[in-house]
């Protein structure tokens, strides 16, 4: 089985949007990334776009600034593979959630809701993920001409407390 997921982060607030999985889904009532299983020969990005459209009610993430692959997990027997992405958008938005979600929340980075889906927990608490997030933020900052931007500056403080 192949699956994809994404953590969506608002540039304006520096918060991440998490999905509370429905009681009818596997890993029910756990917080996790947005995404799901790929269909047939669907590619990772194609599947992620479809899943986000289904789960968020939008044709993609509104006002996306950047997207980056952050991690690929494959089981030893290679029967399961999950590809994780980080999506940076301009601002928080309200999704129109579907039956796979019981809710959503925007949270400060490093202050993840509980209980976390085990796969999301492994990703979100990993140094590799934090490094990718830092790199994306730094890249966006260096491209900006507006020196007034403090986008996500609190992340270093939040990360230090994790």
Walk through the language-model features, giving the residues of each.
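Conserved N-terminal beta-strand and adjoining loop/helix that marks the start
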Residues: 1-17, 37, 86
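Charged phosphate-binding loop/patch that engages nucleotide di/tri-phosphates or the phosphate backbone
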Residues: 121-162
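Conserved beta-strand and immediately adjacent loop positions that scaffold enzyme active sites
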Residues: 5, 30, 103
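Conserved acetyl-CoA binding element of GNAT-fold acetyltransferases
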Residues: 30-36
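Unchanged
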Residues: 36-64, 69-123, 157-161
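A conserved beta-turn-beta hairpin within the catalytic core of GNAT-like acetyltransferases
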Residues: 25-29
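Short, small-residue-rich loop/turn micro-motifs
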Residues: 20-24
């Amino acid at each position: 089985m192949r699956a994809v997921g994404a953590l969506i982060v608002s540039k304006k607030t520096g918060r991440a949007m998490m999905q509370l999985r429905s009681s009818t889904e596997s890993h029910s009532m756990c917080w996790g990334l947005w995404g799901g299983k790929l269909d047939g020969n669907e590619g990772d990005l194609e599947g992620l776009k479809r899943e986000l459209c289904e789960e968020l009610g939008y044709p993609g993430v509104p006002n996306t600034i950047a997207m980056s692959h952050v991690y690929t997990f494959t089981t030893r027997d290679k029967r399961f593979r999950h590809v994780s992405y980080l999506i940076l958008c301009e601002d928080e938005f309200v999704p129109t959630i579907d039956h796979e979600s019981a809710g959503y929340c925007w949270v400060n980075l490093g202050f993840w809701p509980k209980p976390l889906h085990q796969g999301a927990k492994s990703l979100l608490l990993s140094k590799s993920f934090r490094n990718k997030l830092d790199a994306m933020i730094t890249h966006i900052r260096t491209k900006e001409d507006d020196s007034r931007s403090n986008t996500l500056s609190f992340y270093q403080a939040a990360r230090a407390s994790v």
